[in-house]
Amino acid sequence: MSASSDAEMAVFGEAAPYLRKSEKERIEAQNKPFDAKTSVFVAEPKESYVKSTIQSKEGGKVTVKTEGGATLTVREDQVFPMNPPKYDKIEDMAMMTHLHEPGVLYNLKERYAAWMIYTYSGLFCVTVNPYKWLPVYKPEVVAAYRGKKRQEAPPHIFSISDNAYQFMLTDRENQSILITGESGAGKTVNTKRVIQYFATIAVTGEKKKDESGKMQGTLEDQIISANPLLEAFGNAKTVRNDNSSRFGKFIRIHFGTTGKLASADIETYLLEKSRVTFQLKAERSYHIFYQITSNKKPDLIEMLLITTNPYDYAFVSQGEITVPSIDDQEELMATDSAIDILGFTPEEKVSIYKLTGAVMHYGNMKFKQKQREEQAEPDGTEVADKAAYLQSLNSADLLKALCYPRVKVGNEYVTKGQTVQQVYNAVGALAKAVYEKMFLWMVTRINQQLDTKQPRQYFIGVLDIAGFEIFDFNSLEQLCINFTNEKLQQFFNHHMFVLEQEEYKKEGIEWTFIDFGMDLAACIELIEKPLGIFSILEEECMFPKATDTSFKNKLYDQHLGKSANFQKPKVVKGKAEAHFSLIHYAGTVDYNITGWLDKNKDPLNDTVVGLYQKSAMKTLASLFSTYASAEADSSAKKGAKKKGSSFQTVSALFRENLNKLMTNLRSTHPHFVRCIIPNETKTPGAMEHELVLHQLRCNGVLEGIRICRKGFPSRILYGDFKQRYKVLNASAIPEGQFIDSKKASEKLLASIDIDHTQYKFGHTKVFFKAGLLGLLEEMRDEKLAQIITRTQAVCRGFLMRVEYQKMLQRREALFCIQYNVRAFMNVKHWPWMKLFFKIKPLLKSAETEKEMATMKEEFQKTKDELAKSEAKRKELEEKMVTLLKEKNDLQLQVQSEADSLADAEERCEQLIKNKIQLEAKIKEVTERAEEEEEINAELTAKKRKLEDECSELKKDIDDLELTLAKVEKEKHATENKVKNLTEEMAGLDETIAKLSKEKKALQETHQQTLDDLQAEEDKVNILTKAKTKLEQQVDDLEGSLEQEKKLRMDLERAKRKLEGDLKLAQESTMDMENDKQQLDEKLEKKEFEISNLISKIEDEQAVEIQLQKKIKELQARIEELGEEIEAERASRAKAEKQRSDLSRELEEISERLEEAGGATSAQVELNKKREAEFQKLRRDLEEATLQHEAMVAALRKKHADSMAELGEQIDNLQRVKQKLEKEKSELKMETDDLSSNAEAISKAKGNLEKMCRSLEDQVSELKTKEEEQQRLINDLTAQRARLQTEAGEYSRQLDEKDALVSQLSRSKQASTQQIEELKHQLEEETKAKNALAHALQSSRHDCDLLREQYEEEQEGKAELQRALSKANSEVAQWRTKYETDAIQRTEELEEAKKKLAQRLQEAEEHVEAVNAKCASLEKTKQRLQNEVEDLMLDVERSNAACAALDKKQRNFDKVLSEWKQKYEETQAELEASQKESRSLSTELFKVKNVYEESLDQLETLRRENKNLQQEISDLTEQIAEGGKQIHELEKIKKQVEQEKCEIQAALEEAEASLEHEEGKILRIQLELNQVKSEVDRKIAEKDEEIDQLKRNHTRVVETMQSTLDAEIRSRNDALRVKKKMEGDLNEMEIQLNHANRLAAESLRNYRNTQGILKETQLHLDDALRGQEDLKEQLAIVERRANLLQAEIEELWATLEQTERSRKIAEQELLDASERVQLLHTQNTSLINTKKKLENDVSQLQSEVEEVIQESRNAEEKAKKAITDAAMMAEELKKEQDTSAHLERMKKNLEQTVKDLQHRLDEAEQLALKGGKKQIQKLEARVRELEGEVENEQKRNAEAVKGLRKHERRVKELTYQTEEDRKNVLRLQDLVDKLQAKVKSYKRQAEEAEEQSNANLSKFRKLQHELEEAEERADIAESQVNKLRVKSREVHTKISAE
């Protein structure tokens, strides 16, 4: 990172000191004294790490002195070396000499203290929250960062943004910026700054218009305005942050082709819904609630019906309501303007505010408990009225839906009572759902507005998401966030080191690729893979009785002890309870699973949601338009096996969104920003060490440093390294001659005493391991100290010598002066000397006059000359000014040209690098694609053959599965049809009731019409008849209700159905009462109308006659309809009889289901509930009947009065003619409706009869299908026996075949030697032929390459001649092209030489010419490379390069002609050798074919007989020859065998209940065993061949390694899954048996209870006859009730609803005791009323008996059949679900076994690769030889034909056989290398495990030592205190003395 000067930093303005150190600070840091050996960081408990100085080292302990003066003794591993002062406040921490935690921490701390909040750490940009405003985001800073590379400017979020923008423009690739961190770390602020930067540098400036033409602001304004709106609804105050984002967001900013903003969109994740209804004390809800109540917009307060005090609303006032740093009033205006800018319509804006206000009102809704019930009811409706008004709902409907939601039971909806707590929970869930859906809808609308439909090409995504969270209480939300960060960290690790390793590859460093993205795979798979945490959570959500405990147990069963990342948490006092722990990359997190199932299902009140969907507010209706309940979803999709999207769990939706996010990120080039919170108190400048270290671990900064340390984090250019470290050994680099910087660096490093494995040389840089650069710095400092000391000594000597010479000169001058002074003192008194003193001055005055005259003349001349020179000077100055201007202009032009040239060179270099990288990538991709295509082709061929081989084995399984699936489908269809029939019959009942109502309405209208006519008496008669019929119907309904009530006593199991019927009947009764009231109102209206229309009837007498006729016709029609209704009733009775017949047939099924399922705990509880409810219903019904009778009597009286009045008014009816004309048309319409209703009744009748007939047909079909199924089972058993006999026959034939093969082998041993000789000759010939063919092929390939190179050079020459002005870029392109071509040609030629050297050892005389040509080609390549280097060094020599290219062209023509000649010669030789080989091979194969095949068959059969006995052991030895894995596989084998026994035992136990599956399971097991034995036989058969195939195919090793590892992991996973499934199967079967036993016991108890109840009823009746009998019967009843209660408590003590059952039973006992007491007290009154009661009872009994005799034969059986059918259908469905679940589990197990076998086959096939074809052909020959053996046994002539056919086929396949043998040798090498690699991996794994165990033991030891040290410190401290006390005492004593 280059350090800028102060002048260069001036462009940043006042932000410069906050971005980079000044030059003065850098110089001071470099000159600061520093001792690298003693300056260290030391681990310290309070401060984590402190700066210290080493005092001494002794025995693994180090004594240090800290900066604070304290002395500490620590272990060596707790001491970390300090970086030199020049690294203080370094801008990129990855460049530090010593990379460790304290170095990173103190670098961040020192930069933070200087307010430099941005720091790089490799690919990361780390930012620390300053908690104050810094001037680093001003416009001049944005301008300063624009277009700057990362290394050219200080670290900043603007630098990251600009780099992403520039990469997008240059690389044409999407970019992403990932901003993570804890709450309060500054993620949202940095996201805003990124958006601000893009909105500044990529502005379009065009304003958008909506349809009305209103300006909505520019796209930049809208992007910026999206933040205030999202913050208002998605941000809240937390403990750490006043403006914390409670959701994650991914903002995509799209750019056009010119780099200008085109559009944007936002995706959100994990909105914290719970904050809507609950906040902690120091927090508050979302900002929008407090903005609304800030009273900035009073009209908003008035519109939302709220107050300005947030404490009036429970949902938003649980914590704080104000934030000092936020002005809610200003924020409201910003939010309001943002809504307008973003283009929301006024209606949508009002809807947003209204829904927000409704959520606030929801929190104030009150509910209370009804008296004597657990049912909730509203406690006031004022708040509900406000909420309903704001949501455009009906308040009564809303309250009813909350307190009495409709729940689907079976096929009908019933009203369910809710407790107060359930209602409050439902209100909270609805509030959260409304808020969440509104938030998501707003995001969608914002995206629609930001989508400008402009052309867009690339985007930059900004991810603002919460960082890793480790709290005291971690729930599902924390798991989701931490899982997201795991995925992001894995993504970063992979990306970071891929870039790092790409640089290694580009620099030519040998490096084995390490994918650090796999480091976190274990934790990620534990969470998201099948049978992971999310999978188990979703599975539990599907079970209605699942609890948190069952979820925890499943987690423990599946993962505890099996996954290293899953642990059981430690119990810590004072800490929240935890259920399991996960080891994440950032630390171990304890999770609490309480309430996870409810959170994941996220249930809502479906009835209220239905109201929302029908709301008049369009926004609310659209929010829930796609919602469907779980019941509706399941019922609507019974036929399908998929879950509907409407019933998607929270975890599934989260994973789907996360996968989309990761897909988006993988398609981009990422940039990483990590935000750090320095302290918890929001204090500027303060930094808490432990807090920051925790975040660095969680954010992956330390993880990134760990990855850096694995590679070569320090790197220096060769020139810089030579200049800086030449001082270490100057003699290593000779002076006076030029030497390359790379060679100089190599010599210099080789001459230094360091570890030479710690550095590598690249093409342009030297790379160092972590710490080595620090060692070089120490050595340089020592060397500099020596040199400076020596230099100082020389300088001091020189200075002293100079000073000495000066002292000598001063001495001589003093001597001279002293001599002259002495002489002057001797002569000064002489007379002549005095005269001399007087005359001397006079002589000088004369001389001075002369001098003055001359000086005046000179002065005048000089003045004239000066004037001339001044004129000339002015002229020259003017010329100089013009010249300076021209010079400056030229300098500016030169500078601009130099800059443009430098930019062009940089771009050219960048393009060259990119081209090199892309060409390398293209080459790798093409090679991979070719390899993958070859592998794919081989795999597809093998797969097809395997499928053909297995198809016959699978046919029976598939047929059986198809037949069983068909039977099951038909069963389901039959059951569905039965259910549909019952539903349709219920619907018909409803239609009949509706028709009866309509008939009544018609009769009433007719009666009213007849009242208007003269024939009023007829009308009165009709009305009376109608009323009598109505009363009869009412009586019938009452009787049916009584009958249903009595039937419910006998049909306890159908409670839900009967309750629904009862409520429907009550509703129909209420409807009838409403109809009667409506009739009364209509009568009153008619009376009023008649009074008004009497005057008009006289004019309509003629019309009256016609109407009377029509009325009579209609009356006749009504009578006909009545007859049809009676007929319909008869048909209905007939249908009910048919249903009763069907019910008898279905009762058998129900008995089986009762035995299988029985009565559940809920049914037993419902039995008890029903007894109390039936008593209550009987009383209610009696009251209802009394009220109904009174109402009917009142109606009759009222009707009689109205008839009397109408009789009086008959004379005045003549004046209603005009009214009757109008009513005539209405009457016609009613008549038409009546006729259509009659037709509908007749159609319904016909449909009912058809359905009855179809039901009968379905029952008969079901019987026939059951018979067919039984026949299929019998066929399967017969087929099994037949297969066993066939197996015996095959074994016998195998023995015979062995004997025959032995005979053949003995008969053909005589010709072995001759065939071996011929074989040897043939092999030599084929080797020579193959060598020539390979040489020819390589020669052709080289010719093609040379031809292509020649064409490219011609094009290059023409291009250079055409465009010499563009010589720079073109020469660079040619340079890179020729470099890559030369490298490729070199590699290819070297490979060709190696192949030729290996394959043509025995035929060197045939390829000497080829080697000579290769050498000439090498020379040509060297000459070409030299010419390319000349072009690269000097651009001006392009003409010379063109001449060289012409010369090369001629040389290539010569080479090409030589190659063509050689090609023709080799072609001729090849054809001659092919002819000879064909003639020889035909003769050879005639003699050889029979023997080879028989010999191969003999060997394979012998190996088969041997290996069949040890197939498992051979397989395990083949897979794991490394040692320990043998034991593991043997354990797995034992587990598999044990699991197989368990499966068989479980299947035998379930045989009684699953007889229809037994045959299928046995058949599948038999076939699996057969397939397994056959595959094992084949594998064992090929063992020896595999031993020969383990020698070659080195390329396959690399691809096969990952495949084998994956197969081993998948096999282990499959074994675990299989074991888990089998365990679940056993548990379910045990539970089924247990449930059967409980069902039988409960059924017996139920029957006993019924008998007891009957006996109790008899005893109570006897009690009415006498007091003594009553006491005795009461005692019996009490005893039996107690017994029954005890039995019920014993049976259902473990169930959750036992307490309620017990309370109900106790209440019943209390009622009974109260009744007994009443009987005791009223004994005398009972005796008096005894006779009356007996008479009443006898009358009631007689009536009841009559009713029962009349109706029980018809309706009782029908209704019983219906209810039984419904219950049986439900129970059957449950059993079928259970069976289907078991079947799915079984199929999964079978599929797992098949997949394992298939994978094993694929692994073996991949290992065999080319040899597989030979194996398959040999297998084909085995089959053919088996046929030949059978034919020989039969002594048939077909054997001869078969032999001839085989001879022909062998001739055709001979060539390929020879190639296959070579492949065998290659595969042998392959397998050997593969096994060696497996062993090395095992050793690495064992070493890693041992290292981890050692580290763990060290940790425990250290922890123990730390505890001991703390104890010793405490003891020492106490001793020190004691000594201090003693010393004080001694001191006081001494002072006292």
From Swiss-Prot:
Positions carrying Phosphoserine: 392, 625, 1091, 1095, 1161, 1236, 1242, 1260, 1291, 1302, 1305, 1473, 1494, 1513, 1553, 1573, 1602, 1713, 1725, 1738
Any one GO MF annotation of this record: structural constituent of muscle
UniProt-listed InterPro entries: Kinesin_motor_dom_sf, Myosin_head_motor_dom-like, Myosin_N, Myosin_S1_N, Myosin_tail, P-loop_NTPase, XRCC4-like_C
Ranges for domain Myosin N-terminal SH3-like: 35-84
Domain Myosin motor: 88-781
Disease linkage: Carney complex variant: Carney complex is a multiple neoplasia syndrome characterized by spotty skin pigmentation, cardiac and other myxomas, endocrine tumors, and psammomatous melanotic schwannomas. Familial cardiac myxomas are associated with spotty pigmentation of the skin and other phenotypes, including primary pigmented nodular adrenocortical dysplasia, extracardiac (frequently cutaneous) myxomas, schwannomas, and pituitary, thyroid, testicular, bone, ovarian, and breast tumors. Arthrogryposis, distal, 7: A form of distal arthrogryposis, a disease characterized by congenital joint contractures that mainly involve two or more distal parts of the limbs, in the absence of a primary neurological or muscle disease. DA7 is characterized by an inability to open the mouth fully (trismus) and pseudocamptodactyly in which wrist dorsiflexion, but not volarflexion, produces involuntary flexion contracture of distal and proximal interphalangeal joints. Additional features include shortened hamstring muscles and short stature.
UniProt note: domains: The rodlike tail sequence is highly repetitive, showing cycles of a 28-residue repeat pattern composed of 4 heptapeptides, characteristic for alpha-helical coiled coils.
Function (record text): Muscle contraction.
Protein name from the UniProt record: Myosin-8
